[in-house]
Protein backbone atom coordinates (compact mmCIF):
# COMPACT_ATOMS: atom_id res chain seq x y z
CA UNK A 1 0.00 0.00 0.00
CA UNK A 2 1.58 3.26 -1.13
CA UNK A 3 0.58 6.78 -0.01
CA UNK A 4 1.22 9.13 -2.87
CA UNK A 5 0.73 12.28 -0.80
CA UNK A 6 3.46 11.49 1.75
CA UNK A 7 7.13 10.97 0.95
CA UNK A 8 8.60 7.59 1.66
CA UNK A 9 11.43 8.88 3.89
CA UNK A 10 8.96 10.18 6.54
CA UNK A 11 8.14 6.62 7.61
CA UNK A 12 11.74 6.09 8.83
CA UNK A 13 12.28 6.53 12.55
CA UNK A 14 15.66 8.24 12.06
CA UNK A 15 14.06 10.90 9.91
CA UNK A 16 11.44 11.56 12.62
CA UNK A 17 14.15 12.28 15.22
CA UNK A 18 16.02 14.63 12.88
CA UNK A 19 12.85 16.60 12.12
CA UNK A 20 12.05 16.95 15.84
CA UNK A 21 15.54 18.30 16.61
CA UNK A 22 15.30 20.84 13.81
CA UNK A 23 11.90 22.11 15.11
CA UNK A 24 13.33 22.64 18.61
CA UNK A 25 16.31 24.60 17.22
CA UNK A 26 13.99 26.86 15.27
CA UNK A 27 11.91 27.62 18.39
CA UNK A 28 15.01 28.50 20.40
CA UNK A 29 16.42 30.81 17.74
CA UNK A 30 13.18 32.69 17.14
CA UNK A 31 12.10 32.96 20.77
CA UNK A 32 15.28 34.11 22.48
CA UNK A 33 13.36 37.17 23.77
CA UNK A 34 10.03 35.96 25.34
CA UNK A 35 8.63 39.52 25.64
CA UNK A 36 8.42 39.79 21.89
CA UNK A 37 6.30 36.64 21.80
CA UNK A 38 3.86 38.02 24.39
CA UNK A 39 3.52 41.25 22.46
CA UNK A 40 2.67 39.36 19.35
CA UNK A 41 -0.05 37.41 21.16
CA UNK A 42 -1.55 40.48 22.84
CA UNK A 43 -1.70 42.65 19.73
CA UNK A 44 -4.77 41.76 17.60
CA UNK A 45 -4.64 41.82 13.84
CA UNK A 46 -5.28 45.08 12.05
CA UNK A 47 -8.52 43.76 10.52
CA UNK A 48 -9.97 43.02 13.95
CA UNK A 49 -9.15 46.53 15.21
CA UNK A 50 -10.90 48.10 12.26
CA UNK A 51 -13.99 45.92 12.78
CA UNK A 52 -14.28 46.78 16.49
CA UNK A 53 -13.97 50.51 15.84
CA UNK A 54 -16.66 50.20 13.20
CA UNK A 55 -19.03 48.52 15.71
CA UNK A 56 -18.45 51.16 18.34
CA UNK A 57 -19.19 53.93 15.92
CA UNK A 58 -22.52 52.29 15.09
CA UNK A 59 -23.85 52.71 18.70
CA UNK A 60 -25.95 55.79 19.34
CA UNK A 61 -23.81 56.98 22.23
CA UNK A 62 -20.66 56.82 20.09
CA UNK A 63 -22.39 58.59 17.27
CA UNK A 64 -23.52 61.30 19.65
CA UNK A 65 -19.95 61.68 20.97
CA UNK A 66 -18.53 61.85 17.45
CA UNK A 67 -21.20 64.38 16.46
CA UNK A 68 -20.39 66.30 19.67
CA UNK A 69 -23.99 66.19 20.84
CA UNK A 70 -24.12 67.05 24.56
CA UNK A 71 -25.83 64.55 26.85
CA UNK A 72 -29.11 65.86 28.25
CA UNK A 73 -29.24 66.84 31.87
CA UNK A 74 -30.42 64.04 34.15
CA UNK A 75 -32.85 65.93 36.39
CA UNK A 76 -35.69 66.75 34.02
CA UNK A 77 -39.22 67.14 35.28
CA UNK A 78 -41.59 64.40 34.27
CA UNK A 79 -44.29 65.74 31.95
CA UNK A 80 -46.86 63.48 33.62
CA UNK A 81 -46.29 63.72 37.37
CA UNK A 82 -43.85 66.69 37.39
CA UNK A 83 -41.32 64.69 39.38
CA UNK A 84 -37.56 65.25 39.28
CA UNK A 85 -36.81 61.59 39.97
CA UNK A 86 -35.94 60.95 36.32
CA UNK A 87 -32.97 59.65 34.39
CA UNK A 88 -31.64 59.68 30.86
CA UNK A 89 -31.88 56.29 29.19
CA UNK A 90 -30.62 56.50 25.59
CA UNK A 91 -31.02 58.36 22.37
CA UNK A 92 -33.65 57.54 19.86
CA UNK A 93 -32.49 54.97 17.36
CA UNK A 94 -33.50 57.16 14.45
CA UNK A 95 -32.57 60.59 15.66
CA UNK A 96 -29.98 61.97 18.08
CA UNK A 97 -32.15 64.96 18.84
CA UNK A 98 -34.75 62.81 20.65
CA UNK A 99 -33.26 61.45 23.88
CA UNK A 100 -35.40 59.14 25.90
CA UNK A 101 -36.00 59.61 29.62
CA UNK A 102 -37.54 57.50 32.33
CA UNK A 103 -39.52 58.66 35.38
CA UNK A 104 -38.91 56.51 38.45
CA UNK A 105 -41.96 57.87 40.23
CA UNK A 106 -44.69 56.99 37.76
CA UNK A 107 -42.54 54.39 35.94
CA UNK A 108 -43.14 55.75 32.46
CA UNK A 109 -40.91 56.62 29.53
CA UNK A 110 -41.09 59.74 27.48
CA UNK A 111 -39.14 61.00 24.49
CA UNK A 112 -38.34 64.60 23.84
CA UNK A 113 -40.38 65.66 20.88
CA UNK A 114 -42.43 62.46 21.07
CA UNK A 115 -45.47 61.16 22.93
CA UNK A 116 -45.70 60.13 26.57
CA UNK A 117 -46.25 56.48 27.31
CA UNK A 118 -49.40 56.06 29.38
CA UNK A 119 -48.88 52.42 30.35
CA UNK A 120 -46.40 51.83 33.20
CA UNK A 121 -43.43 49.65 32.38
CA UNK A 122 -43.37 46.22 34.02
CA UNK A 123 -45.07 45.22 37.24
CA UNK A 124 -44.43 46.17 40.80
CA UNK A 125 -41.64 44.83 42.93
CA UNK A 126 -41.91 41.32 44.23
CA UNK A 127 -42.28 42.51 47.79
CA UNK A 128 -45.16 44.76 46.84
CA UNK A 129 -46.78 41.97 44.85
CA UNK A 130 -46.76 39.62 47.81
CA UNK A 131 -48.22 42.20 50.15
CA UNK A 132 -50.96 43.07 47.67
CA UNK A 133 -51.89 39.44 47.10
CA UNK A 134 -52.10 38.83 50.84
CA UNK A 135 -54.26 41.87 51.38
CA UNK A 136 -56.58 40.80 48.57
CA UNK A 137 -56.92 37.30 49.96
CA UNK A 138 -57.80 38.63 53.39
CA UNK A 139 -60.39 40.92 51.86
CA UNK A 140 -61.97 38.01 50.00
CA UNK A 141 -62.08 35.90 53.14
CA UNK A 142 -63.61 38.73 55.11
CA UNK A 143 -66.27 39.29 52.47
CA UNK A 144 -67.05 35.57 52.43
CA UNK A 145 -67.40 35.60 56.19
CA UNK A 146 -69.73 38.58 56.08
CA UNK A 147 -71.89 37.01 53.42
CA UNK A 148 -72.02 33.71 55.22
CA UNK A 149 -72.89 35.36 58.51
CA UNK A 150 -75.50 37.51 56.86
CA UNK A 151 -77.05 34.48 55.20
CA UNK A 152 -77.06 32.61 58.49
CA UNK A 153 -78.68 35.51 60.28
CA UNK A 154 -81.31 35.97 57.59
CA UNK A 155 -82.31 32.30 57.49
CA UNK A 156 -83.02 30.27 60.63
CA UNK A 157 -80.94 27.26 61.51
CA UNK A 158 -83.11 24.19 61.08
CA UNK A 159 -80.62 21.92 62.85
CA UNK A 160 -81.64 23.26 66.27
CA UNK A 161 -84.93 21.61 67.32
CA UNK A 162 -85.49 24.11 70.13
CA UNK A 163 -86.55 26.72 67.59
CA UNK A 164 -89.59 24.68 66.51
CA UNK A 165 -91.78 25.45 69.52
CA UNK A 166 -94.10 27.48 67.35
CA UNK A 167 -94.28 27.44 63.59
CA UNK A 168 -95.05 31.11 63.45
CA UNK A 169 -91.45 31.98 64.40
CA UNK A 170 -90.10 30.58 61.14
CA UNK A 171 -90.31 33.31 58.49
CA UNK A 172 -90.42 30.94 55.52
CA UNK A 173 -93.12 28.63 56.91
CA UNK A 174 -96.65 29.93 57.14
CA UNK A 175 -99.06 27.86 59.18
CA UNK A 176 -102.17 29.30 57.52
CA UNK A 177 -101.96 27.41 54.28
CA UNK A 178 -105.07 27.40 52.07
CA UNK A 179 -105.07 23.62 51.65
CA UNK A 180 -104.35 22.62 55.25
CA UNK A 181 -106.15 23.21 58.54
CA UNK A 182 -104.50 25.17 61.35
CA UNK A 183 -101.46 23.32 62.64
CA UNK A 184 -102.58 23.58 66.26
CA UNK A 185 -105.18 20.87 65.62
CA UNK A 186 -102.80 18.39 63.99
CA UNK A 187 -102.27 16.64 67.29
CA UNK A 188 -105.93 15.78 67.71
CA UNK A 189 -106.21 13.03 65.09
CA UNK A 190 -106.10 10.02 67.36
CA UNK A 191 -107.68 8.92 70.54
CA UNK A 192 -105.84 9.29 73.80
CA UNK A 193 -103.51 6.78 75.47
CA UNK A 194 -101.75 5.73 72.28
CA UNK A 195 -98.31 5.95 73.79
CA UNK A 196 -97.44 9.08 71.81
CA UNK A 197 -97.11 12.70 72.85
CA UNK A 198 -100.10 14.13 71.01
CA UNK A 199 -103.81 13.78 71.46
CA UNK A 200 -106.62 13.32 68.95
CA UNK A 201 -108.84 15.52 66.85
CA UNK A 202 -112.17 15.19 65.13
CA UNK A 203 -112.80 15.35 61.43
CA UNK A 204 -115.37 18.09 61.91
CA UNK A 205 -112.72 20.32 63.47
CA UNK A 206 -110.45 19.68 60.52
CA UNK A 207 -113.16 20.54 58.02
CA UNK A 208 -114.13 23.68 59.91
CA UNK A 209 -110.49 24.69 60.07
CA UNK A 210 -110.10 24.17 56.35
CA UNK A 211 -113.14 26.22 55.58
CA UNK A 212 -112.19 29.01 58.00
CA UNK A 213 -108.51 29.23 57.13
CA UNK A 214 -108.36 28.84 53.39
CA UNK A 215 -111.90 29.07 52.15
CA UNK A 216 -111.42 26.41 49.49
CA UNK A 217 -114.84 24.85 50.23
CA UNK A 218 -116.73 28.07 49.62
CA UNK A 219 -117.34 27.16 46.00
CA UNK A 220 -118.83 23.79 47.00
CA UNK A 221 -121.17 24.97 49.71
CA UNK A 222 -124.88 24.32 49.26
CA UNK A 223 -127.35 26.76 50.75
CA UNK A 224 -129.66 25.20 53.38
CA UNK A 225 -132.76 26.11 51.37
CA UNK A 226 -131.60 24.09 48.36
CA UNK A 227 -130.47 21.04 50.33
CA UNK A 228 -134.00 19.69 50.86
CA UNK A 229 -134.97 20.33 47.24
CA UNK A 230 -131.93 18.87 45.49
CA UNK A 231 -130.91 16.15 47.96
CA UNK A 232 -133.96 14.98 49.90
CA UNK A 233 -132.59 11.48 50.34
CA UNK A 234 -129.42 12.75 52.07
CA UNK A 235 -131.08 14.58 54.94
CA UNK A 236 -131.12 12.99 58.42
CA UNK A 237 -128.95 10.11 57.42
CA UNK A 238 -126.28 8.58 59.57
CA UNK A 239 -123.51 9.01 57.03
CA UNK A 240 -123.75 12.83 56.76
CA UNK A 241 -123.49 15.69 59.19
CA UNK A 242 -125.67 18.68 58.39
CA UNK A 243 -124.40 22.14 59.24
CA UNK A 244 -125.40 25.69 58.39
CA UNK A 245 -122.74 25.91 55.71
CA UNK A 246 -122.66 22.60 53.82
CA UNK A 247 -123.06 18.86 53.95
CA UNK A 248 -119.80 17.08 54.73
CA UNK A 249 -119.74 13.29 54.37
CA UNK A 250 -117.93 11.36 57.07
CA UNK A 251 -115.67 8.48 56.31
CA UNK A 252 -117.16 5.45 58.05
CA UNK A 253 -116.15 1.88 57.46
CA UNK A 254 -117.56 -1.41 58.70
CA UNK A 255 -116.84 -0.68 62.38
CA UNK A 256 -119.75 -1.45 64.70
CA UNK A 257 -121.08 0.72 67.49
CA UNK A 258 -119.48 -1.49 70.12
CA UNK A 259 -116.10 -0.04 69.21
CA UNK A 260 -116.55 3.01 71.42
CA UNK A 261 -117.47 0.85 74.42
CA UNK A 262 -114.48 -1.40 73.87
CA UNK A 263 -112.18 1.60 73.56
CA UNK A 264 -113.36 2.97 76.90
CA UNK A 265 -113.01 -0.42 78.51
CA UNK A 266 -109.47 -0.86 77.27
CA UNK A 267 -108.16 2.53 78.42
CA UNK A 268 -107.42 1.41 81.99
CA UNK A 269 -105.64 -1.73 80.83
CA UNK A 270 -103.48 0.24 78.45
CA UNK A 271 -102.43 2.68 81.18
CA UNK A 272 -101.19 -0.20 83.34
CA UNK A 273 -99.28 -2.00 80.61
CA UNK A 274 -97.94 1.07 78.84
CA UNK A 275 -94.40 0.65 77.53
CA UNK A 276 -91.68 3.28 77.27
CA UNK A 277 -91.73 3.67 73.54
CA UNK A 278 -95.50 3.45 73.16
CA UNK A 279 -95.39 1.31 70.04
CA UNK A 280 -97.11 -1.73 71.57
CA UNK A 281 -99.91 0.40 72.99
CA UNK A 282 -100.47 1.98 69.62
CA UNK A 283 -100.88 -1.44 68.04
CA UNK A 284 -103.20 -2.56 70.84
CA UNK A 285 -105.40 0.49 70.49
CA UNK A 286 -105.59 0.09 66.76
CA UNK A 287 -105.96 -3.66 66.44
CA UNK A 288 -107.39 -4.76 69.77
CA UNK A 289 -110.82 -3.23 69.47
CA UNK A 290 -112.05 -3.94 65.95
CA UNK A 291 -115.28 -5.84 65.47
CA UNK A 292 -115.80 -7.21 62.00
CA UNK A 293 -119.41 -8.17 61.45
CA UNK A 294 -119.92 -10.12 58.30
CA UNK A 295 -122.39 -12.70 57.05
CA UNK A 296 -120.29 -15.54 58.52
CA UNK A 297 -120.50 -14.27 62.15
CA UNK A 298 -116.75 -13.93 62.58
CA UNK A 299 -115.76 -11.79 65.55
CA UNK A 300 -112.26 -10.76 66.62
CA UNK A 301 -112.10 -9.09 70.02
CA UNK A 302 -109.63 -8.35 72.78
CA UNK A 303 -106.46 -8.55 70.72
CA UNK A 304 -103.39 -7.57 72.72
CA UNK A 305 -105.18 -6.76 75.95
CA UNK A 306 -102.89 -8.90 78.11
CA UNK A 307 -100.67 -10.27 75.32
CA UNK A 308 -103.04 -13.26 74.96
CA UNK A 309 -105.58 -14.03 72.24
CA UNK A 310 -108.58 -14.89 74.36
CA UNK A 311 -112.18 -14.48 73.36
CA UNK A 312 -111.61 -15.68 69.83
CA UNK A 313 -114.72 -17.44 68.55
CA UNK A 314 -115.42 -18.73 65.11
CA UNK A 315 -118.49 -20.45 63.68
CA UNK A 316 -116.85 -21.29 60.41
CA UNK A 317 -117.32 -24.89 59.35
CA UNK A 318 -113.92 -25.10 57.77
CA UNK A 319 -112.16 -24.42 61.08
CA UNK A 320 -109.25 -22.39 59.75
CA UNK A 321 -108.57 -18.68 60.02
CA UNK A 322 -109.41 -16.37 57.17
CA UNK A 323 -108.26 -12.78 57.12
Curated annotation (Swiss-Prot):
The organism's taxonomic lineage, starting at the top: Eukaryota, Viridiplantae, Streptophyta, Embryophyta, Tracheophyta
Cellular localization per UniProt: Nucleus
Protein's name according to its UniProt entry: Dof zinc finger protein DOF3.6
Compositional bias ranges of the Low complexity kind: 136-159
Annotated region described as Disordered, given as residue ranges: 121-160, 304-323
Zinc finger motifs (Dof-type), residue ranges: 76-130
Gene Ontology cellular-component annotations: nucleus
Positions of transmembrane segments: none
Sorted UniProt keywords: DNA-binding, Metal-binding, Nucleus, Transcription, Transcription regulation, Zinc, Zinc-finger
GO molecular function, one term: zinc ion binding
Signal peptide boundaries: none
Principal cellular location given in the protein's record: nucleus
List of residues binding Zn(2+): 78, 81, 103, 106
Tissue expression pattern: Predominantly expressed in roots.
